Design a protein with these regions (language model features):
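OB-fold/S1-family single-stranded nucleic acid-binding modules
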Residues: 56-73, 218-219
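Conserved catalytic cores of phosphodiester-cleaving nucleases, focusing on short active-site segments
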Residues: 9, 113-143, 156
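Domain-level recognition of nuclease-like catalytic cores that cleave nucleotide substrates
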Residues: 173-226
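A short acidic/basic microdomain associated with nuclease active sites
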Residues: 94-108
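Short nucleic-acid-contacting surface segments enriched for D/E, G, S/T with interspersed K/R
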Residues: 37-50
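Short aromatic-glycine-enriched beta-strand elements
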Residues: 16-21
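Short, charged beta-turn/beta-strand-edge "cap" motif at the junction between a beta-strand
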Residues: 13, 53-58
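Nucleic-acid nuclease catalytic cores
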Residues: 137-147, 154-186, 208
């Protein structure tokens, strides 16, 4: 996926989870943050961030914050991007070679899972999770407790137990990650649910991405350490 009209700016602060203040061309701008997660380890005063200029002339703010530099690493933090890049990749045959249909927002049980992918032989239910937390070259999820994430894992487990191909798919919005693991220190219940689901047939996959200020593309599979 690609962004249009991307500019670099300096992060100042984040008064709430929806907006940030940045310095652009010597002026302070208020910009929506396309990720309502905590992201405290990323949005550090003085860091460089990437902004995409909006296309709606009537909007109150001109830019959206989409990425941040953490040292020498560029991290895409757009919460909408993982589903978009997965859909592009799956449509191009990256996930499965014999796809006949891709249905987003698929109702299953008591949840809506991100995708139902149909092949000639079976249905594949996929829940996508974007990962932005990096420590020493390894990625962790989640960066904050997510009861919704636990619920999705349990729905996937029920699907796997009925014979469907159920997949939890981590899109790591960072390049050159060595591994992905559940963040047990932040949300032990998520890690416990994930390990139980994997033991009952849920496939847990992770791929990192090629990340530039104006693009994000699924790159290669990386190990998941449960």
């Amino acid at each position: 996926m690609h962004y249009q009209n991307v500019r670099a700016a300096k992060f100042i602060d984040r008064p709430n989870r929806f907006i940030a203040h940045v310095e652009l061309d010597g002026k302070v701008e208020t910009v929506p943050v396309k990720n309502t997660g905590r992201c405290r380890e990323l949005l550090v005063p003085g860091c460089t961030v990437s902004l995409e200029k909006g296309t709606n002339p009537n909007r109150k703010t001109a830019y959206d914050l989409i990425a941040v530099e953490k040292g020498s690493i560029l991290i895409n933090m757009d919460a909408q991007a993982p589903n978009k890049v997965f859909a592009e990749w799956a449509a191009a045959g990256g996930f499965l070679s014999d796809v006949t249909a891709i249905r987003p927002e698929y109702a299953y049980g008591g949840s809506r899972l991100d995708f139902c992918i149909e092949t000639k032989e079976r249905l594949h239910l996929v829940e996508v999770k974007g990962v932005t937390l990096e420590e020493n070259g390894n990625a962790l999820f989640p960066d904050a407790p997510t009861e919704r994430g636990v619920k999705h894992i349990r729905e996937l487990q029920r699907a796997a137990e009925t014979g469907l191909d159920a997949v939890l798919f981590f899109v790591v919005q960072i390049e050159d990650i060595h591994s992905v693991a559940p963040n047990d220190a932040t949300h032990p219940a998520f890690g416990e649910a994930l390990r139980e689901a994997a033991a009952h047939g849920v496939r847990v996959l992770a791929y990192d991405c090629d990340v530039t200020p104006d693009s994000l593309k699924i790159r290669r599979e990386v190990p998941v350490i449960l």
